[in-house]
């Protein structure tokens, strides 16, 4: 059965932000030609989860990114007609349906996990039109190899580097900040680059 109250919570990008309700956020449900990135973009499967955690981090950091902060996550599909076609195809398909979807307990082989990698581009703009870019890259499949290393390093960081952290439900940025980034670079195959 459908639970309208739950659907409303799941649709709210601020549902984990301790009661804060910020400005209207960009829609991550439809493909569009993103002028900031210079490419067509399509919905990203993890965006509904990740955006809530980013807004929770901002709230826990006393709105370090601003109370008017807007955030969305999309998959870059390329410029022009080809980028538009790929974006529309991605938006119309469900990666959790079909004959080739792994069954519970199945997943990529060890070789596939180790050969995987990712490159995430963050683009920020302000009201004056200034732009900043950052990238995060990982040396293994993000859903399996890299995630397990991030979880292990987060646990070690909390135990060894954040002894004074009071109890609570945190996101990584307010709980561990740069201490976690240092561990991820040193031990988990991640690289962080803050461009201009």
Segments (PLM) and residue ranges:
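C-terminal catalytic/substrate-binding lobe primarily of soluble NAD(P)-dependent oxidoreductases
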Residues: 1-196
